């Protein structure tokens, strides 16, 4: 699939999501996709190999959280931690789309953290860092902590709670509404909002689960 075809698909997806991204940001997203493809030949960053599927399942899926995230932050400078980031999803996409947000992507696998560091350098993203560490060891504080297919909600908040700012929130990307997982959240954590995400060209269910410490 040519870059031009991927660019057309990205443009259509961005329009469907109602996002306003510059030509430079769109170019960075395509460059990022190419970096994933290049590194994936040597390192197993993602099981998805087809460029069109990468566009939909990785870029557009991650872009779907940008509008809800901006609504929460109000466009103000803030900090975000992406836990179990892997190839940088959604962290790298957020760093590109939201330059006002300082994004740290943490992964326990050294080669994935090295890839994230390479992405930050190659795409010249001063607001992006790749960290090789365990989330339990990070102090933060982060205004938003996110994850995409990382762990159960209970484990996610337990492992990352030490890095959350006093008035911070967790933003978990999930498939269908995780009723069973919500029921096992610790008593000191409340789910205060769940919203359905509409990912262009993706037929499965996607939702965003927002959580915070009880006041």
In which residue ranges do the predicted regions lie?
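Class I SAM-dependent transferase core
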Residues: 1-75, 111-114, 118-126
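Residue-level signal for inorganic ion chemistry
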Residues: 36, 94, 173-174, 211
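Conserved SAM/SAH cofactor-binding pocket of Class I
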Residues: 60-147, 157-158
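Active-site capping/gating segments
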Residues: 101, 176-215
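Conserved beta-strand segments of alpha/beta enzyme cores
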Residues: 102, 127-129, 169, 190-193
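Hydrophobic pocket-lining residues within nucleotide cofactor-binding pockets
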Residues: 135, 150, 199
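A short glycine-rich, Lys/Arg-flanked "PGG" loop and its adjoining helix->strand segment in the class I
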Residues: 157-169
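Conserved beta-strand signature within the Rossmann-like core of class I S-adenosyl-L-methionine
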Residues: 167-177
């Amino acid at each position: 699939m040519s870059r031009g075809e991927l660019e057309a698909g990205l443009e259509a997806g961005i329009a469907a999501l109602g996002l306003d991204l510059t030509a430079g940001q769109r170019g960075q997203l395509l460059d990022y996709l190419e970096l994933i493809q290049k590194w994936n030949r040597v390192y197993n960053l993602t099981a998805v190999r087809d460029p069109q599927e990468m566009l939909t399942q990785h870029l557009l899926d991650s872009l779907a959280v940008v509008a809800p995230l901006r609504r929460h932050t109000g466009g103000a400078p803030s900090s975000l931690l992406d836990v179990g980031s892997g190839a940088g999803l959604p962290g790298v996409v957020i760093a590109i789309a939201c330059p006002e947000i300082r994004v740290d992507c943490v992964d326990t696998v050294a080669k994935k953290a090295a890839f994230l560091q390479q992405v930050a350098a190659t795409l010249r993203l001063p607001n992006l860092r790749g960290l090789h560490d365990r989330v339990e060891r990070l102090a933060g504080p982060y205004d938003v902590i996110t994850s995409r297919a990382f762990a159960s909600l209970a484990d996610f908040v337990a492992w990352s709670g030490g890095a959350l700012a006093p008035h911070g929130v967790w933003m978990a990307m999930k498939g269908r509404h995780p009723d069973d997982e919500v029921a096992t959240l610790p008593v000191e954590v409340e789910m205060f909002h769940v919203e359905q995400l509409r990912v262009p060209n993706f037929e499965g269910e996607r939702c965003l689960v927002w959580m915070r410490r009880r006041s």
